[in-house]
From Swiss-Prot:
Function noted in UniProt: Involved in the transposition of the insertion sequence.
Pfam families: DDE_Tnp_1
InterPro entries associated with the record: RNaseH-like_sf, Transpos_IS4, Transposase_11
Protein name according to UniProt: Transposase for insertion sequence element IS231B
Keywords: DNA recombination, DNA-binding, Transposable element, Transposition
Length: 478
C-alpha cells in the first residue's frame, strides 16, 4: 500500500509521541523511581533539559540550566536543587528512554529500495567513537591508554544502512575492546545480512560464524595474518597421506602489490586465512593511489607518536595496498566493487561527526558522574530523534522526487527545528505531523546531496535509482 507523504509522517509522529509525551514520561518516572511523590521537577522537566532545550548540559553552568528550564516550562529551581536531581535514578530514566527509542519501530519503514537490498537483507555498519571526560572519572571510565586518554567514554554502534535502524549499541569505558563487542553483535545476525567490518573488529572466528549463519561479510584483513592457496602438487607419505605442511602455499602479498598499478584490483578467488583453523574466503587486493598512500603514512606517523603504537616492518612495506576478505558471491559483488562496498562503512563516520559537531556530546566541564551520564543519554536521545527523522525524510525524498538527501545537511536542518518538535509533542501528533511536513518541504528544497565532484555516493554504490541535476539525466549505480 502506497501511503501519502502526510500519512507516512502521521504514522511516524504517532510512534515518536508514544515514547515522548509528557504523560508517558511522568508515568515512566514513577515506574523507575525518579519521582516518588508530586514534585515541581518531574520526569518531563528532566527530559526537557537534557533532550530538548540545551546542547551544553555538561558544560553550561547550573544557573544557566535553571534559566533555560524556567524559560521552557515555567519551573523555578535553585542551582543546588537542580544538581541534586541529577542522580542515578535520573540516569536510569534517560537511559531507559533511549533504549526503548532505538529498539522501537521508528526506522522500520524507512528502508530505501536498492539493488543491494535484493541481495542483502541489511547492510550492517559497525564502528565506535570515543571522547575524553573529566580525569576524576578514570576509575569508572578508564580511557584507551597510551598518552591519548586518562578517562574516556566509548560508544559502539551498529546500524543498518538501508533503514537507519540501530541494531546494537553500547556506552562504556574508553578502554572497552572493539572485538569483544563485535562478537556480541553476532547474536542479532539474520541470514542475508551483509556485515562490513574494519580492522578493529577483525576476527577469523566471527567471519566464520557469519558464513555459517548464512550472512555475508566484507572486512579488511589484518596484515599479521597469512594468506594461503591450496597446493596443486602436495607431497605425500608412502602410505598415500598428504604431508600437512605441503597442503598450502603462502601467497607473497608484497610481490602482488609491486605488480599492481594505482587503483588496480586483484583477486584470489579461493584463498585460506589463518595458520591452524583456516578460513576459506575470497581475498581482494586493492592498490592505493599515491594520494591515499601519503594519507595512510601520515596517519601511521600520528598513531605511532600519539598512541605509542609501533607498526611492524611488514605493515609499513604493505602500506600501498588494502587487503579485503569476503564471502559475497562474485556475481553479486565483483572484485572491482569490493572497495566501493567497503567504503560504505565511512557513512558511520558522518553520523559520528554530527554527534560532536552538531550535538556537542563531547563537551563537558569538571562535573559529577551522574550529570555527565544524563548529558550523554540526553544527547543520544536527541541524536536518535534527529537521525531517525532524517532516514524517514531520505526515503520520502527518494520516493517522491527520486533525489538523494545529504545526511549531514539534513540532520543539521532537523536539529534547527528541535524546539518546534518539542512544542508540538507537548500538544498532539497532528501538530507534530505539520512540523514534519514543513521540514520535508525544506529538505526537498535545500537538503539534496551535492554531486559537484562526480564521486560515487552511497546511492550509487547500493544501486539506488535516482535523479540529479549534474547533467539533467537519470543516474543509476551499477
Amino acid at each position: 500500500m502506497n501511503l501519502s507523504i502526510q500519512d507516512e509522517l502521521q504514522l511516524f509522529s504517532e510512534e515518536l509521541c508514544r515514547h515522548l509525551t509528557p504523560s508517558f514520561l511522568e508515568e515512566l518516572a514513577k515506574k523507575l523511581g525518579f519521582v516518588k511523590r508530586k514534585r515541581k521537577f518531574s520526569g518531563s522537566e528532566l527530559a526537557t533539559i537534557f533532550i530538548w532545550i540545551s546542547q551544553r548540559t555538561a558544560s553550561d553552568s547550573l544557573v544557566r540550566l535553571c534559566s533555560q528550564l524556567h524559560a521552557a516550562t515555567g519551573t523555578l529551581m535553585s542551582p543546588e536543587g537542580l544538581n541534586k536531581r541529577f542522580d542515578k535514578k535520573a540516569v536510569e530514566f534517560l537511559k531507559y528512554i533511549f533504549s526503548t527509542l532505538w529498539k522501537s519501530k521508528l526506522c522500520k519503514t524507512s528502508a530505501i529500495s536498492s539493488t543491494a537490498l535484493t541481495h542483502f537483507q541489511r547492510i550492517r555498519i559497525l564502528d565506535a567513537t570515543i571522547f575524553q571526560i573529566p580525569k576524576h572519572l578514570a576509575s569508572i571510565y578508564p580511557g584507551s591508554g597510551g598518552c591519548a586518554q586518562t578517562a574516556g567514554i566509548k560508544i559502539q554502534l551498529e546500524y543498518d544502512l538501508h533503514s537507519g535502524q540501530f541494531l546494537n549499541f553500547q556506552v562504556g569505558p574508553g578502554k572497552n575492546n572493539d572485538k569483544t563487542f563485535g562478537t556480541e553483535c553476532l547474536d542479532t545476525l539474520r541470514p542475508g545480512d551483509l556485515c562490513i567490518r574494519d580492522l578493529g573488529y577483525f576476527s577469523l572466528e566471527d567471519l566464520d560464524q557469519m558464513d555459517q549463519r548464512g550472512a555475508y561479510y566484507i572486512s579488511r584483513l589484518k596484515l599479521n595474518h597469512t594468506v594461503y592457496i591450496k597446493n596443486p602438487s602436495p607431497e605425500y607419505f608412502r602410505n598415500g597421506t598428504v604431508k600437512k605442511q605441503s597442503q598450502y602455499i603462502q601467497v607473497d602479498l608484497e610481490h602482488i602489490m609491486n605488480h599492481l598499478k594505482p587503483g588496480q584490483t586483484y583477486e584470489i578467488k579461493e584463498a585460506y586465512i589463518g595458520k591452524n583453523q583456516k578460513l576459506f574466503t575470497r581475498v581482494i587486493i586493492y592498490r592505493l593511489t599515491e594520494k591515499q598512500i601519503q594519507e595512510r603514512r601520515k596517519k601511521q606517523a600520528y598513531t605511532e607518536s600519539k598512541k605509542g603504537i609501533t607498526f611492524s616492518e611488514k605493515s609499513k612495506r604493505l602500506t600501498g595496498i588494502n587487503i579485503y576478505v569476503s564471502n559475497t558471491p562474485e556475481g553479486i559483488v565483483p572484485m572491482e566493487q569490493i572497495h566501493d562496498f567497503y567504503s560504505l562503512r565511512w557513512q558511520i563516520e558522518i553520523i559520528f561527526k554530527t554527534w560532536k559537531s552538531l550535538f556537542q556530546i563531547h563537551h563537558w566541564q569538571n562535573i559529577k558522574q551522574e550529570r555527565l551520564e544524563c548529558h550523554v543519554y540526553g544527547r543520544l536521545i536527541a541524536i536518535f530523534i534527529c537521525s531517525s527523522t532524517m532516514f524517514k525524510m531520505r526515503k520520502l525524498l527518494l520516493q517522491k522526487n527520486k533525489r538523494e538527501l545529504s545526511e549531514y545537511k539534513a540532520i543539521g536542518m532537523i536539529q534547527d527545528h528541535v524546539s518546534l518538535l518539542y512544542q508540538a509533542i507537548q500538544r498532539n501528533t497532528q501538530d507534530l505531523t505539520k512540523i514534519l511536513i514543513r521540514l520535508f518541504d525544506l529538505l526537498q528544497k535545500n537538503g539534496r546531496k551535492s554531486h559537484r565532484y562526480e564521486r560515487k555516493t552511497i546511492f550509487d554504490i547500493m544501486g539506488v535509482v535516482y535523479e540529479y541535476n549534474g547533467f539533467g539525466k537519470q543516474k543509476k549505480a551499477a
